[in-house]
């Protein structure tokens, strides 16, 4: 005896309705529920007519297990039940239950909802509970709304047995009430009665189970109060999943670490504990969950792309002709860079090894300043864009890798003050220029 697989509501909508199930009867042992269960099949015979088929098949299977198909109005499902009809169980009938042939729909409509219950009333003395009790049957057949009130009036001052279903306990019980119009209040029962669509028993799913108090529905995130703290260094009560790529906890994606859920306060404890603490060693072995810092990669360095063309030459300084020596024994080196030459104002000549390394040449011939780069692949193209400077006639300076000084000597010359030989040569040059201006040209014809 037991429950089998459930199915949907059968066609026809009629069967034998169980009104009452006796204690320790074969029907109770099989799990049949009063008021909600309808026997629709016994063996392989469909019970869709009001006849003696049910009684005949029960008598034919006395002390033998027989299968019944039962429809439940509360779950709206059909289940299979195995029952053993017997006349040896100590009560009346082979099943120990009272049945009546009717339709499912009409049986679900005949429900009287108990509303407010007055204190010391006949309903309160009988133990009726307000708003949770539903009167579903009695010793007599109740088919209409007025049948219940007629039954109460006919039992004035007499005990009356009622079958009552309680929605909180989800069970039916038998209640004995004695209607009394002189109890001191209104009505014969002293309670409100509701009837109709809004007062029917609510249907329940077949898989519904009572949950313990405080249980969390599936899929609900746990709050802080529901988390259980475990001491550091102790193994957790659940298995820790290990990733095949390594012993790290969490999943690593794009240089970011996904931290596992941590107990509040454990993050600070994990940071305060040093590498030599006992809990730190236990955490390295994978024995406990500890807080992990999320490694953050620094941003890549900013790559700046320089302008490949020539820069503005207005901010750079050019050679001062007054500092150029005309002595044949001294050769001056011109500062040449690959970017620009300035023509702003008079500045001292700085020395560099760039002209020596590149093999550059600077020449003052006549009144033009020319620069050439023989070793450069684009020397001809760059020479057209270089500036030209007009200098006095007779001043010429040439620098070549063979005749020029080394980079170290040139730097030493720029740091040291001009020697006396350079000053003498400079004075001689200025004297010759002044004589040439003072001496007038001979007039033609004299």
Curated annotation (Swiss-Prot):
Gene3D superfamilies reported for this sequence: 2.30.42.10
Subcellular location: Golgi apparatus, cis-Golgi network membrane
Biased composition (Low complexity): 343-354
Region Disordered, annotated ranges: 1-20, 202-252, 343-446
Keyword Hydrolase: no
Binding locations of Zn(2+): 17, 19, 102
Principal location: Golgi
GO cellular component annotations of the record: Golgi apparatus; membrane
UniProt feature coiled coil, ranges: none
One Gene Ontology molecular-function label: metal ion binding
A biological process term (GO) from this entry: negative regulation of dendrite morphogenesis
Phenotypic consequence of gene deletion: No visible loss of Golgi stacking in intestinal tissue at postnatal day 10, 21 or 42, in combination with conditional knockout of GORASP2/GRASP55. However, cisternal cross-sectional diameters are reduced and rims of the Golgi cisternae are vacuolated. Abolishes expression of GOLGA2/GM130 in the cisternae.
InterPro entries, per database record: GRASP55_65, GRASP_PDZ, PDZ_sf
Modification type Phosphothreonine: residues: 216, 220, 224
Bilayer topology annotation: Peripheral membrane protein
Protein family according to the UniProt entry: Belongs to the GORASP family.
Function recorded in the entry: Key structural protein of the Golgi apparatus. The membrane cisternae of the Golgi apparatus adhere to each other to form stacks, which are aligned side by side to form the Golgi ribbon. Acting in concert with GORASP2/GRASP55, is required for the formation and maintenance of the Golgi ribbon, and may be dispensable for the formation of stacks. However, other studies suggest that GORASP1 plays an important role in assembly and membrane stacking of the cisternae, and in the reassembly of Golgi stacks after breakdown during mitosis.
Protein's recorded name: Golgi reassembly-stacking protein 1
Gene giving rise to this polypeptide: Gorasp1
């Amino acid at each position: 005896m037991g429950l089998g697989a459930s199915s949907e509501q059968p066609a026809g909508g009629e069967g034998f309705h169980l009104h009452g199930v006796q204690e320790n009867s074969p029907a109770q042992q099989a799990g049949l529920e009063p008021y909600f269960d309808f026997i629709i099949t016994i063996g392989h015979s469909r019970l869709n007519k009001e006849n003696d088929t049910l009684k005949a098949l029960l008598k034919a299977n006395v002390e033998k297990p027989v299968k019944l198909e039962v429809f439940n109005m509360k779950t709206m499902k059909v289940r299979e039940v195995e029952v053993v009809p017997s006349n040896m169980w100590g009560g009346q009938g082979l099943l120990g239950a009272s049945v009546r042939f009717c339709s499912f729909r009409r049986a679900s409509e005949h429900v009287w909802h108990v509303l407010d219950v007055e204190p010391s009333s006949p309903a309160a003395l009988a133990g009726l509970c307000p708003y949770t009790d539903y009167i579903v049957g009695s010793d007599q057949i109740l088919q209409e709304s007025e049948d219940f009130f007629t039954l109460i009036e006919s039992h004035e001052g007499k005990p009356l047995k009622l079958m009552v279903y309680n929605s909180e306990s989800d069970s039916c019980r038998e209640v004995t009430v004695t209607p009394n119009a002189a109890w001191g209040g209104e009505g014969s029962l002293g309670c409100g009665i509701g009837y109709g669509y809004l007062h029917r028993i609510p249907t329940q799913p077949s898989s519904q189970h009572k949950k313990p108090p405080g249980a969390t529905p599936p899929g609900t995130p746990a709050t802080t109060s529901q988390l259980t703290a475990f001491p550091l260094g102790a193994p957790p009560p659940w298995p820790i999943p290990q990733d095949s790529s390594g012993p790290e906890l969490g999943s690593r994606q794009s240089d970011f670490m996904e931290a596992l859920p941590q107990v509040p306060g454990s993050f600070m404890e994990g940071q305060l504990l040093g590498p030599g603490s006992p809990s730190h060693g236990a955490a390295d072995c994978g024995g406990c969950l500890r807080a992990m810092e999320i490694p953050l990669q620094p941003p890549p360095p900013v790559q700046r792309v320089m302008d490949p063309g020539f820069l503005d030459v207005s901010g750079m300084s050019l050679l001062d002709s007054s500092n150029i020596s005309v002595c044949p024994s001294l050769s001056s080196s011109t500062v040449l860079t690959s970017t620009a030459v300035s023509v702003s104002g008079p500045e001292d000549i700085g020395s560099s090894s760039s002209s020596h390394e590149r093999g550059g040449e600077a020449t003052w011939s006549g009144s033009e300043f020319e620069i050439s780069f023989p070793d450069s692949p684009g020397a001809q193209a760059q020479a057209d864009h270089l500036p030209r400077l007009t200098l006095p006639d007779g001043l010429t300076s040439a620098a070549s890798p063979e005749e020029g000084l080394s980079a170290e000597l040139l730097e030493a010359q720029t740091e040291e003050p001009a020697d006396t030989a350079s000053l003498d040569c400079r004075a001689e040059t200025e004297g010759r220029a002044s004589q040439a201006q003072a001496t007038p040209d001979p007039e033609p014809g004299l």
